[in-house]
Amino acid sequence: MGVRPEATPNPNAIKFTTDKMIFEGTNSISVMSGDTSEHEILNDLMKLDGVDNVFGYQNFITVNKHFDVEWDDLVVEVVKIMEEYGY
């Protein structure tokens, strides 16, 4: 089914879910501006213009954008990166 963007109660956050496991185990991973992660997919998402922070857990990644950025192009870029990683 690929990557599925899903709205969240926060208009500045979208949850991107996949049928495949992205992160093993029961720990969540958060990356804030200026941080890096051992998970390259999160680092690549943080490089996108307009991304404020990312949160990953098992089969999803939630991307939080800056309030003044529109989702239109950003959703396409997030899905593209996740698909490049095989999700």
Each predicted region: which residue ranges?
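Glycine-rich, charged/polar anion/phosphate-binding loops
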Residues: 1-3
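Short glycine-/aliphatic-rich beta-strand segments at the starts of folded cytosolic domains
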Residues: 8-31
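Short, surface-exposed beta-strand-loop junctions and turns on beta-sheet-rich folds
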Residues: 22-23, 69-71
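Short amphipathic alpha-helix segments
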Residues: 33-47
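Short acidic amphipathic segments
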Residues: 45-60
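Conserved short beta-strand edge segments in small beta-sheet-based binding/regulatory domains
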Residues: 84-87
